[in-house]
Each structure stands twice: as structure tokens, then as C-alpha cells.
Amino acid sequence: MEYNVKTFKEMLIEENSRHNLVSRKSLPVELEKHIEDSRSLLNFMDLKGSRVVDIGSGAGFPGLVLAIYCPEGEFLLLESDLKKTEFLQAVINRCGLKNCQVLRKRIEEVGRSELRNSFDFCSCRALAMMNIVLEYGLPLLRLGGKLLLWKGKNYSREIEQAANALDILGGKVVDIFTYSLMAERDRAIVVVEKERDTPAKYPRRVGIPAKRPL
């Protein structure tokens, strides 16, 4: 496990020198922060034996980190950017991760595919406001599945603004895990349970959820 984390760090630093996957400012420190933030979920929840889809995986936070630290889970990383998906696949291959796959596709398209209603958990970090991410993530979950949203100090405001989206899409906030990260306080993982089937017309076509949030 620690070998895989070390390999991931080394590959990310190398790739970041060619393509800006994460901020280059104080990269070693920021990298540790991203990893610790991603794995913080495992202090609160057990993903063993679960199917997890990570949306907007980017450079691998939180999905790839969770796959490394939770080999008993099954992870699908969704990312539409070619360079990022190539990087994610390279790390998976180098580390020999058998529990993790990458899919290069837009989230809205996947939400209308055979993968709809098929995951136990959907994770998302630093992608968009909550009312947008709800439309991306809830269609992918089975009934009773949970959407896991990494948020900062304004999470309460985002929850208030997402009330309409929660009602339309069949979700309910059931837990909020708060924690501190290094010198940064007021971090939270907001847990949204899928209580009702999401109407078939959601997610809307590519680009619309972000352009016209519910």
C-alpha cells in the first residue's frame, strides 16, 4: 500500500511537470494535503465490498487514493480529459491495482447508460457546487446508495442552495463528517442518500446541469 502511494506521488510530480494536473505551488505539501483529504473518508465510512464511482477524478483525488487504501472496494474513475485518464491508467498499471478502472466519458452520458442505478457510493471532490453534482451523481446510485461530497467551510450554504435539487432528484442529506486538514479547519464530507428513484430525464444533456443548475 505505501509503495503504491509513493509510486502515485512520484508519477504525479513527474507528469505535473509536463501537464498541469494540480497546482504547482508548493507541490509536495499540496500533494500530501490532497492525499490526506481524500483518505479522510475512511475515518468515517467503510467501503469494503462496495462499488464506488468517482466522478471528475482529475489527477486521482479522491478516487484513486481511495482505491489504493481500500483494496477490498471496487472503483470506477470517471474523467473526460484524455491526458488525465491516460495518467490515471498509467498509475493503475504501474501499481497493479486490480480493483480500479478508468472510463473516459462525460458524467451526463454515463448517467444515462447501463451504469445508471448501479453503484453503492459516488465520490466527488472539488468538481462543482452541490446542486450541480447532485444531478451528476444521484442517477448513478442504487436506491439507498450514498453520494459523498468533499466540501469546505461553506458547506452549510451549499446544502441550503441544493434544497430544490435534492427534492427533484430524490436525495436527502443524512450525515456531515467534519474534520481539520493540516492547518485548514472546517472541512466536511456531506453524505447524501438516494431515497427515491431519480426521474428518467435526469441528468440532462451534457453541459446543461452546470449551465442551468436545479
Curated annotation (Swiss-Prot):
PANTHER family per UniProt: S-ADENOSYL-L-METHIONINE-DEPENDENT METHYLTRANSFERASES SUPERFAMILY PROTEIN
HAMAP family with a match to the protein in the record: 16SrRNA_methyltr_G (MF_00074)
Function: Specifically methylates the N7 position of a guanine in 16S rRNA.
Source domain of life: Bacteria
Residues noted as binding S-adenosyl-L-methionine in the record, renumbered to the chain: G56, F61, I107, E108, R125
Major place of residence: cytoplasm
GO MF annotation, one: rRNA (guanine-N7-)-methyltransferase activity
Subcellular location: Cytoplasm
EC number: 2.1.1.-
Family that this chain belongs to: Belongs to the methyltransferase superfamily. RNA methyltransferase RsmG family.
Protein name: Ribosomal RNA small subunit methyltransferase G
Signal peptide start-end: none
Pfam families reported in the protein's UniProt record: GidB (PF02527)
EC main group: transferase
NCBIfam families assigned: rsmG_gidB (TIGR00138)
GO cellular component, one term: cytosol
UniProt entry tagged with the keyword Transferase: yes
Keywords: Cytoplasm, Methyltransferase, rRNA processing, S-adenosyl-L-methionine, Transferase
Organism field: Syntrophomonas wolfei subsp. wolfei (strain DSM 2245B / Goettingen)
